[in-house]
């Protein structure tokens, strides 16, 4: 009887470990150790392409998918210092000084256009993480992205998020990030759908 109980405990413990491990992979970078410090250079890219299976967070199910026509309005927030240098959901390192973001369902990595509807400022970000899982927020931005959209101090803003295309795994942003400030975006929008230019 004692041997049976011991084996039962081992089996249950093993199953619990597997379950927790699979669940933790869906949470954001806070679950991973910090590899790079606040002032360290963080390498770009190096992750893997990921869409993912349906997953549950706090009792709510999310269904990752490729959605080339994604165009949504909602609340954006940002995450910074504490998460800097930790692995993101697709195996890249979060860099608060880069233009990146987290989204609950879109493929990783991808390029998104984010427009702050409170001041009409727009940028392109590299999507490489999952989240946010708070209220009606639809995107979590890096600290740098929040600065460029002038929402850092406020913490949140009403934004429009539009999918552009899949991003390269090597982290080479090319023309997307070389001149991300207002004015350069016209070149990008000509190569995308008319929905992206209808602001």
Model-derived features: positions:
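Secreted/periplasmic proteins
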Residues: 23-199
């Amino acid at each position: 009887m004692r041997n049976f109980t011991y084996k039962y405990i081992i089996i249950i413990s093993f199953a619990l470990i597997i379950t927790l491990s699979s669940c933790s992979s869906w949470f954001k970078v806070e679950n991973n150790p910090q590899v790079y410090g606040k002032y360290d250079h963080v390498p770009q890219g190096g992750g893997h392409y990921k869409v993912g299976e349906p997953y549950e967070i706090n009792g709510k199910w999310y269904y990752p998918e490729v959605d080339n026509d994604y165009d949504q309005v909602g609340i954006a927030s940002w995450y910074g210092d504490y998460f800097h240098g930790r692995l993101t959901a697709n195996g890249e390192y979060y860099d608060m000084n880069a233009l990146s973001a987290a989204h609950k369902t879109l493929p990783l990595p991808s390029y998104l256009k984010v427009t702050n509807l409170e001041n009409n400022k727009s940028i392109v970000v590299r999507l490489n993480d999952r989240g946010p899982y708070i209220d009606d927020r639809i995107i979590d931005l890096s600290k740098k992205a929040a600065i460029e959209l002038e929402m850092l101090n406020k913490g949140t803003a009403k934004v429009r998020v539009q999918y552009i295309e899949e991003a390269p795994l090597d982290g080479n942003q090319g023309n997307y990030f070389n001149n991300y400030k207002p004015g350069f975006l016209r070149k990008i929008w000509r190569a995308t759908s008319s929905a992206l230019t209808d602001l």
